[in-house]
Amino acid sequence: MANEVQVLPSPLKGRYAPAVKAGGMRISKKQEMGVLERHTKKTGLEKTSAITNVAKIQMLDALTDTLDKLNHKFPATVHTAHQKPTPALEKAAPMKRAYIIQQPRKC
């Protein structure tokens, strides 16, 4: 019996901490490292988002300039491309169908 090696149970079960029973319900423990990572502020992200916003604005300006140039060259083509075709006949709304229930209703 002295030669047997005791195997200590690992603190994680299936990569997650074991649940704690409180008030007849099982509640999972939250890891301390996850809480610390969530509250840390990332300063590098703010700088990159400002740069990407400027790049997006410049891209949109270039796009609107090219669309304006095309609109001046081909005004009729651009106008007809954005219009929906008008239907020859308008669809009539179908009558509402009466649902036949073969079982008596609960009152």
From Swiss-Prot:
<protein>
    <recommendedName>
        <fullName>Death-associated protein-like 1</fullName>
    </recommendedName>
</protein>
<dbReference type="GO" id="GO:0010467">
    <property type="term" value="P:gene expression"/>
</dbReference>
<dbReference type="GO" id="GO:0043022">
    <property type="term" value="F:ribosome binding"/>
</dbReference>
<dbReference type="GO" id="GO:0031369">
    <property type="term" value="F:translation initiation factor binding"/>
</dbReference>
<comment type="function">
    <text>May play a role in the early stages of epithelial differentiation or in apoptosis.</text>
</comment>
<dbReference type="GO" id="GO:0005634">
    <property type="term" value="C:nucleus"/>
</dbReference>
<keyword id="KW-0221">Differentiation</keyword>
<dbReference type="GO" id="GO:0030154">
    <property type="term" value="P:cell differentiation"/>
</dbReference>
<dbReference type="GO" id="GO:2001186">
    <property type="term" value="P:negative regulation of CD8-positive, alpha-beta T cell activation"/>
</dbReference>
<dbReference type="InterPro" id="IPR024130">
    <property type="entry name" value="DAP1/DAPL1"/>
</dbReference>
<dbReference type="GO" id="GO:0008283">
    <property type="term" value="P:cell population proliferation"/>
</dbReference>
<dbReference type="GO" id="GO:0030371">
    <property type="term" value="F:translation repressor activity"/>
</dbReference>
<dbReference type="GO" id="GO:0006915">
    <property type="term" value="P:apoptotic process"/>
</dbReference>
<keyword id="KW-0053">Apoptosis</keyword>
<dbReference type="GO" id="GO:0141014">
    <property type="term" value="P:ribosome hibernation"/>
</dbReference>
<dbReference type="Pfam" id="PF15228">
    <property type="entry name" value="DAP"/>
</dbReference>
